[in-house]
C-alpha cells in the first residue's frame, strides 16, 4: 500500500517543471526534493494498522487532500509556486497511474497516507471546481466499478488462486527437480570421491607391491649369497672335520704304537740290562782270569779264548736284535726314513704310499677299505724314535 504512494510521488516528481529555490542559492531545483522531504516524513510516521477502504472515501479525506496541496504551496512561498504550477500538481495527483479498475484504490490509498497533515484553508476557485469535477467523476467511476469490482475481484482471486497453485506446483516441481539434481550431484560427488579414493588406494597398493617386490628381490639376493657362503663354510667345515677325524685316528694309532713301542723298549731295556749284567759278570770273571793268568797261563789262554767267544756271542746277539714292527713300512717291509700317516690311521713310507696311490689304488694297504682322502701328514714322533734307534 505504501508502495503505491511511492509510485504517485515518483509520477509527480517527473511531471512537475523545475523551479528555483532559495536553499540552493538560486539554482534550479525540482519539486522532487521539497515534495519528498515533506510527504515522505508523513508516510514514515503514518500508522497502517487498520485496513484502508477500497472504494468509499469520506469528505474529510478529500479536505485533507486539499490541505496537502496547500502544504505543497506553502513550500514554495513568496509567490514562487504559481497558479499554473498548482493546477499541474492537482492534475498529476488526480491522474490515474494504474489500470482503470484499480485507479480508485490507488487514489484512496494515496489519500489515506496523508491524513495526518495539519488543517489549512485553500480558496482557489479554479481548484475547487476542478476538485468537484474530479469528485463527481470519481463517484461515477465508483458506481460503475461497484458492480464489476466483486466480479473482477473474484476473477482476480480465482486467477490468483490458480496462479498460486501453478506457482506452488511449479515450486514443488522445481524443488523436486532441485532435490533430484542435488541428489544426482551428491551421487556424482560421492562417485567421484569414491573413484578418487579407489585410485589413491590402487596407487598406494601398487606402490606397496613395488616396495614388497623390491624387498623380496633384495632378500632373495641376500638368501642366495647366504646359501653360497653357507655351502662354502659347510665344505670347509667338512674338510676340517675329516682332517680332525684323521688326526684323532692317527693320534689314537700313534698312541697305541707309542705304547707298543714303549713296551717293547722296556722289554729291550730289561734284556739290555740283563745283558749288561751278564757282560759285567763276564768282565768280572775275565778280571779274575787275568789275575790268575800268571799262575795259570794255560788256563788264561783258555779263558781268553772263552772270553773272545763270549764277546763274539754278545756281539752276535746285539747284531741280531730286530727293530719294533711300528718302525717297518707295511708296503716295503723296511725301516721307514720319512714316515707319514694316511687316512686309514696307519703310517707308511711317504714315497711308498704315494707310489701306491699313483698306481691306481684307492684303498688302504692294511684294511683294504676305500680311503676318505689322499692327504698325508708326517709322523714326527715315530721318525724321532727311528732316528734314536739308529744312533
Swiss-Prot record:
Gene3D superfamilies: Zinc/RING finger domain, C3HC4 (zinc finger) (3.30.40.10). SUPFAM superfamilies: RING/U-box. It holds the Pfam family U-box. Keywords: Transferase, Ubl conjugation pathway. GO terms for biological process: protein ubiquitination. Coiled coil: none annotated. Its EC number is 2.3.2.27. InterPro entries: Ubox_domain, WD-SAM-U-box, Znf_RING/FYVE/PHD. Pathway: Protein modification; protein ubiquitination. Functions as an E3 ubiquitin ligase. This is U-box domain-containing protein 57. The gene is PUB57.
